[in-house]
Structures are given as structure tokens and as C-alpha cells.
A protein has these predicted regions:
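N-terminal Lys/Arg-rich, disordered targeting/topogenic segments
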Residues: 1-17
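Hydrophobic membrane-insertion alpha-helices, especially the h-region
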Residues: 21-39
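Catalytic glycan-binding domains that act on GlcNAc-containing polysaccharides
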Residues: 36-203
Length: 203
């Protein structure tokens, strides 16, 4: 008789533990689903994950230089998270993380005689130069955004060398074949972010 009571009590303890585990699992599932749906809510994404400061400036230079404004926004997000004071350990400056020597060359190309390194922290100038440079890379790589973005990250010289070494054509789209992991990740990130900006900020 005592053995029967012990088995009953043991079964009850097991059932209580199972019920507790089920409740905890259900709670976690509900919290996860709630978080997922909140994160899918467009105003939340725009406010916290895909912010868009300097929207008018981006649009202005995108129109002037015939660049997809969503691409420019995605590059800025990846490069600086829209922080105009950003300065990398390599010396890249501002919203679009331009190297001073590249910016000086761009200034010469567009005839901006007022350029100096400090002025790269100015949002308008940085976005202007960065957008012009994106347009130049797209022209150089025949409109191929994968190659243009790889060049923006790793340098046009490296991309030209990869094309020669691997017989890549201007129709190249195999991001996995890019030798640098940082550049592979960068290209994927920017292309994915461009899609999100296009969805969240339809023109």
C-alpha cells in the first residue's frame, strides 16, 4: 500500500514538473512571437533599425548623380550608422567613410575648390562625395552593384585584380566568390539593407 502511495506522489511530482515546463515554454513562445511581430511593425523598424537622417540630402544627390537613393542610404547605414562624426581606425571619415585621399581626388573631379579634410564631417559634402563616388564605381563596373560595392569596401584596384585573376565578367554576381570575408559580408549587408529601405521608404 505504501508503495502505491509513493508511486502516486511520484507521478504527481512528474506531472507538476511537466506542467511547469509547459507553462515556461508557452510563455517563452508567446514572448518570442510578440517580439517578432513588434519588430515587423514598420514604424518600429524605421525608428530603431532603419533610421534615415539626412533623407533630403541623400535624395538630392541621388537625383543629381543618378544613383538609387536606397543604395546610398544602405551604404551610409553600413559605413557609419548615420553618425557624421564617424572616424575609422584606417582614417575613413564621416557618414560614407571616405578616405581623405579619395575625397581629395573626388574634389578635383567635381571641381570643389573649398575641400579640406575637416569638411568631410559636413553631412552635405560627405554625402555628395560618397554618392558621386558610388556613381563613378557603377559606371566603371558597368552598372554591376556587387562589383561596385565590393570596390567601395575593398578598393577598385583589388576588384579589378580579382576580375583579372578569376576571369570575372561584368555580369558577376557570385558574392561567395569574393576573396575578402569583410567585403562579402559588406556587399550582402548593403544589398539587404537597400531592399529594406526600398520597402520602408517608398519614393
Amino acid at each position: 500500500m505504501q508503495g502505491f502511495r509513493d508511486r502516486v506522489q511520484q507521478n504527481r511530482r512528474v506531472q507538476r514538473r511537466m506542467a511547469t515546463c509547459f507553462c515556461v515554454a508557452l510563455f517563452i513562445l508567446l514572448v518570442s512571437l510578440s517580439a517578432f511581430f513588434v519588430l515587423q511593425f514598420e514604424p518600429v523598424q524605421r525608428k530603431y533599425f532603419y533610421v534615415y537622417p539626412y533623407h533630403d540630402t541623400v535624395m538630392k544627390y541621388a537625383e543629381i548623380y543618378h544613383v538609387d537613393s536606397n543604395l546610398t542610404a544602405a551604404v551610409i547605414k553600413s559605413e557609419s550608422k548615420f553618425k557624421h562624426t564617424a572616424l575609422s581606425h584606417r582614417g575613413a571619415v564621416g557618414l560614407m567613410q571616405l578616405m581623405p585621399e579619395t575625397a581629395e581626388w573626388i574634389a578635383g573631379q567635381i571641381g570643389d575648390k573649398s575641400y579640406n579634410v575637416e569638411s568631410l564631417h559636413e553631412p552635405d559634402r560627405n554625402i555628395r562625395y560618397g554618392t558621386w563616388y558610388l556613381a563613378e564605381l557603377q559606371r566603371e563596373f558597368k552598372g554591376n552593384d556587387v562589383l561596385a560595392l565590393a570596390a567601395y569596401n575593398a578598393g577598385r584596384g583589388n576588384v579589378k585584380a580579382w576580375m583579372d585573376e578569376n576571369n570575372w565578367s561584368y555580369s558577376f554576381h557570385d558574392i561567395d566568390a569574393i576573396p575578402y570575408k569583410e567585403t562579402r559580408d559588406y556587399v550582402r549587408q548593403v544589398i539587404g539593407d537597400r531592399k529594406k529601405y526600398r520597402e520602408l521608404y517608398p519614393e
